[in-house]
């Protein structure tokens, strides 16, 4: 693999002139934070946000950019080849951040074909269109879960992929598609594998907002299995900073681990949140825990080394103490941001809410109307 320092001339070239950046899944959690950072860091660049407005996305995530002239929202499906081809033909995209994905692991066991369709087939549609359009960089967001788990050995970018659930399998398949364009065409791709990301505005199917929502409703934190499985947690601002750094100076054709310094067992995570949210004593912590049936397959750990990112100059800046404080505060102040609905109804409810918000969003009339 190439030395990241070899891409320094490319950094200068990238910063010349205005660019048009496409973010797929931009109304979702990480995508919306990324768009906001790009808008601040590169105020003259155009940002095109393509999102299908699935249940875990919301136009509220980017309400602050509604009246920004350089920002365009377009509703559409990345699996729709006609839509994507038309998008690249009409929008003059320079850089792609592919964040769109089905990512809820439990759902992947129920709907494995849907996960493979969106995460792998959708990526292939994007790759073909981006390649034909000659974009400058295609940055694909993958996951540490493609490695499978490990109790002791830390994974680096050369470690073999051993995905253990339909979600991580679909992401590994998409990675292979992305890398094949580099191997065959030298198409300028970069792949990232990140730890669990958390922070404000994350939908409550993920563990931290899920626990916070349950505690706000005076319900117990539901823990799958023993709760001894641990995760590394990375604050959302740190992942978006890493993505921009890779856009600016990442080596083409490379994979980058974006790992967190902080690891915690899920049972301990729940206890920490109970202590803060419910102001509980140590003797009361476990009264707020409810152990439920585990996933069909549950990985214990995803330990990664991020030396390649560190050599580029990136390291996490937001400590766990500060990040979780900000996150708890946001959810306490935004209790009705995400509607509280049962799992079976969440898709329909969120899509209905997004439909109403869509009428207020700023869209590009010449293109968006045909995409809706």
Task: State where each predicted segment sits.
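N-terminal Rossmann-like NAD(P)+-binding domain of SDR-like oxidoreductases, especially those catalyzing
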Residues: 1-197, 237, 326, 332-372
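C-terminal substrate-binding subdomain of Rossmann-fold SDR/epimerase-dehydratase oxidoreductases
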Residues: 2-6, 13-14, 76, 215-372
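A short, amphipathic alpha-helix embedded in the catalytic core of nucleotide-handling enzymes
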Residues: 38, 181, 210-214, 242-246
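Residue-level recognition of oxygen-bearing side chains
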Residues: 83, 114, 121, 203, ...
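Active-site loop immediately N-terminal to the catalytic Tyr-X3-Lys motif
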Residues: 112, 192, 204-205, 250
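Proline-centered turn/helix-capping motifs that create local helix->coil transitions or kinks
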Residues: 139, 151, 186, 202, ...
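Short beta-loop-alpha junction of Rossmann-like oxidoreductase domains
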Residues: 149-151, 200-202, 206, 308
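Hydrophobic alpha-helix immediately C-terminal to the catalytic Tyr-X-X-X-Lys motif of short-chain
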Residues: 173, 177, 181, 211, ...
